Swiss-Prot record:
It catalyses: CMP + ATP = CDP + ADP; dCMP + ATP = dCDP + ADP. One of its GO terms (molecular function) is dCMP kinase activity. Its main location: cytoplasm. PANTHER family: CYTIDYLATE KINASE, CYTIDYLATE KINASE/PANTOATE-BETA-ALANINE LIGASE. The lineage of its organism: Bacteria, Bacillati, Bacillota, Bacilli, Bacillales. The keyword Lipid metabolism does not apply. GO terms for cellular component: cytosol. It is an enzyme of class 2 (transferase). CDD domains: CMPK (cd02020). This is Cytidylate kinase.
């Protein structure tokens, strides 16, 4: 029987975390927990209820009454209550404002508690900004993905074009730099590499190369 370890994958926006985490989870038959989708779902809740993204108390009060859940599938489905929000939380409106919502300490604390519950049984791959440092500090394998701003903007540009969104590469670079600044400098659970995390620069690597590297590291932990 496969040892059910916890794998934490952190890194900045568009570093390839979610794509790689899904592949790793599928290969290991682990559960994938998309914490970014949880923050996006909370941002969507604020938008839907006309609550300002800066209104921490208002959003926190709504979150207390809201169930966010995942359902497996070829593409993992995300639900807010009974509403499937898988597509809408990837909209540009949500993408451009999620860092504001994610910077609120009470929101991070509430979601971190939920994320820790997901991980109690092990056998999970969780990606985000503070998984290895705050959510799962005892994860058996911690990965920190990096890539240049130019490469990340290019990836996001291709993603947007594939979804039919008009794209401006220079604007995307600017947005990613702004998102990095917010993520790295926020007071509560900023984006940073855990001391025991393994850094992987994905700038010149394919998705499969990154996934295979993490799988090799995971196999060492599982078989140890």
């Amino acid at each position: 029987m496969t040892k059910k370890i916890c794998i934490a994958i952190d890194g900045p926006a568009a570093a390839g975390k979610s794509t790689v985490a899904k592949i790793v989870a599928k290969k290991l038959r682990f559960v994938y927990i998309d914490t970014g989708a949880m923050y996006r779902a909370v941002t969507y809740i604020a938008l839907k209820n006309n609550i300002a993204y800066e209104d921490e108390k208002g959003i926190a009060a709504l979150l207390q009454k809201t169930v966010i859940r995942f359902e497996p599938g070829e593409i993992q489905q995300v639900f807010v209550g009974n509403e499937n929000v898988t597509e809408v939380i990837r909209s540009l409106e949500i993408t451009n404002h999620v860092s504001i919502v994610a910077a609120h300490p009470s929101i991070r604390e509430a979601l971190q508690e939920r994320q820790q519950v997901f991980a109690t049984e092990g056998g999970i791959v969780m990606d985000g900004r503070d998984i290895g440092t705050a959510v799962l500090p005892n994860a058996e394998l911690k990965i920190f993905l990096l890539a240049s701003v130019e490469e990340r903007a290019e990836r996001r540009y291709k993603e947007n074009m594939a979804k039919g969104f008009a794209g401006d590469l220079d604007q995307l670079k600017k947005e990613i730099e702004e998102r990095d600044h917010l993520d790295y400098t926020r007071t509560h659970s900023p984006l940073k590499k855990a001391d025991d995390a393994i850094e992987v620069d994905t700038t010149s690597m394919s998705i499969d190369e990154v996934a295979n590297k993490i799988l090799s590291l995971a196999e060492l932990k599982i078989n140890n």
